[in-house]
């Protein structure tokens, strides 16, 4: 089982992920991305889904038109783990060329 990050490790990880923030009411991190249109948002989600499936670690997300809200946590560990940080980095890499707002 993967270990939950300590508070110091979580803060350090978030410092390296400036577009992500902690959810105040949960042991999770979140990012909201806005794309130019629904097609671009859905394409982003499809790319993330392939990476998530490969790593067997899946985001919680919500899509409304051009906006995608992503939440990452490791339920088995009861909070944020290295798996969430790794997936957040992958999400940032997928999003970067799409220039989300």
From Swiss-Prot:
It catalyses: (4aS,6R)-4a-hydroxy-L-erythro-5,6,7,8-tetrahydrobiopterin = (6R)-L-erythro-6,7-dihydrobiopterin + H2O. Keywords: Lyase. GO terms for molecular function: 4-alpha-hydroxytetrahydrobiopterin dehydratase activity. Disulfide bonds: none annotated. The keyword Lyase applies. Pfam families: Pterin_4a. GO terms for biological process: tetrahydrobiopterin biosynthetic process. NCBIfam families: PRK00823.1-2, PRK00823.1-3. Belongs to the pterin-4-alpha-carbinolamine dehydratase family. This is Putative pterin-4-alpha-carbinolamine dehydratase.
């Amino acid at each position: 089982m993967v270990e939950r990050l300590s508070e110091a490790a979580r803060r350090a990880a978030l410092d390296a992920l400036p577009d992500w923030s902690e959810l105040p009411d949960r042991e999770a991190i979140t990012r909201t991305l806005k794309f130019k249109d629904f097609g671009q948002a859905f394409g982003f989600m499809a790319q993330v889904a392939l990476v998530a499936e490969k790593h067997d670690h899946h985001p919680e997300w919500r899509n409304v038109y051009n906006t995608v809200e992503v939440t990452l946590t490791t339920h088995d560990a009861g909070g944020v783990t290295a798996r969430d940080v790794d997936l957040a980095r992958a999400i940032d890499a997928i999003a970067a060329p799409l220039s989300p707002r």
